[in-house]
Amino acid sequence: MPEAVIVSAARSPIGRAFKGSLKELRPDDLTAMIVQAALDKIPELDPKDIDDLMLGCGLPGGEAGHNLGRIVAVQMGMDHLPGCTITRYCSSSLQTSRMALHAIKAGEGDVFISAGVETVSRSVKGTSDGLPDTHNPLFAEAEARTAQVAESEGASWHDPREDGLLPDPYIAMGQTAENLARLKGVTREEMDEFGVRSQNLAEQAIAKGFWEREITPVTLPDGTVVSKDDGPRPGVTLEGVAGLKPVFRPDGLVTAGNCCPLNDGAAALVIMSDTKARELGLTPLARIVSTGVSGLSPEIMGYGPVEASKQALKRAGLTIDDIDLVEINEAFAAQVIPSYRDLNIPLDKLNVNGGAIAVGHPFGMTGARITATLINSLQFHDKQFGLETMCVGGGQGMAMVIERLS
């Protein structure tokens, strides 16, 4: 059975939504640039040999609608190349990598593009979830309960299923973070400390040249070249973030200092069979060892990485002790903290270059972006096995184990 290997990775800088460096770029234009950048790194590959372009997008509507994956293929002059657009919210472009893995293992293709994009700045043109009166009234009581809790103080989380009630599948992500923090006993100070850690580590990694290794500069319509992420801030201190006000509840724990911002960005991987890579004389960057995906209550979605990671590790025949570096997507410190603790991940292996609290989390981009970052990190720190994992809106988790090959 062939192995699935990653032979190229590229990502854009990550812009802040609505006010950042990429706010003028359409999602299709940005994706096409980054897919082309990934292909340019492997000129040995004939584009006619690509079997499918699979694009992850968290909210594929508006400018990101119309089956954006296919739009991008045609835009790039590849009418022969099929394209699909996949949403699994925050893990959309990890899902596309999983699909490439499965297709290669099944013998149904040798070369796939796994890409991801989100341009929240452009969401004013519409998103897949933005239409009024589209929620199923079946969940109206659950939504009302969420709204009531959001306005109250001292609320703890209790699984509504235990009372024979439905959970709220439409719940805002910030409310799930508040629920999980209370359920797992995570304090505001711990969350702030983690947020500061992310920013400080990102600042150090920037100084060492780590992040610039994986970023493909993007040229804007006016000719401006963007080559850095907007999010990292130098000199962030615990004292500086301690005064930030809670965002989601009167007595909330989540602030702008301990969660990710809203962002724009795109990333792309070229995944092929090891036999095809050998045929082309390519040295793979990494091998996809295994993946995992899990579900749990939508109201505590942030805990999803735990079960998904256990799945992926079991399928890989590895334990957490075998993993050299771990990237947990930092949607909220409130979810990273209980996840890494319950997976027994040492902090000196976790998000060692900073994470999404600093660099950002464009939903559909994140899966492929973290894969690119993990490969970069395994190379930079000379390590072998990496685990990528994230929580997913709607109450899910996803994970992937990779092995560095070069």
Describe these PLM feature segments.
Residues 55, 175-178, 216, 221, ...:
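Active-site pocket-lining segment
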Residues 111-179:
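Flexible glycine-/small-residue-enriched beta->alpha junction loops
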Residues 1-27, 149-156, 163, 239-303, ...:
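Condensing-enzyme catalytic core mediating Claisen C-C bond formation in acyl metabolism
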Residues 25, 57-112, 168-171, 238-261, ...:
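Conserved catalytic cysteine-centered active-site region
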Residues 47-55, 84-88, 112-116, 190-197, ...:
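Beta-strand segments within the central parallel beta-sheet cores of soluble alpha/beta enzyme folds
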Residues 11-13, 24-33, 44, 152-154, ...:
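N-terminal extracellular/periplasmic Venus flytrap/periplasmic-binding protein-like
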Residues 1-58, 62-72, 76, 176-188, ...:
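Conserved active-site "lid/cap" helical segment
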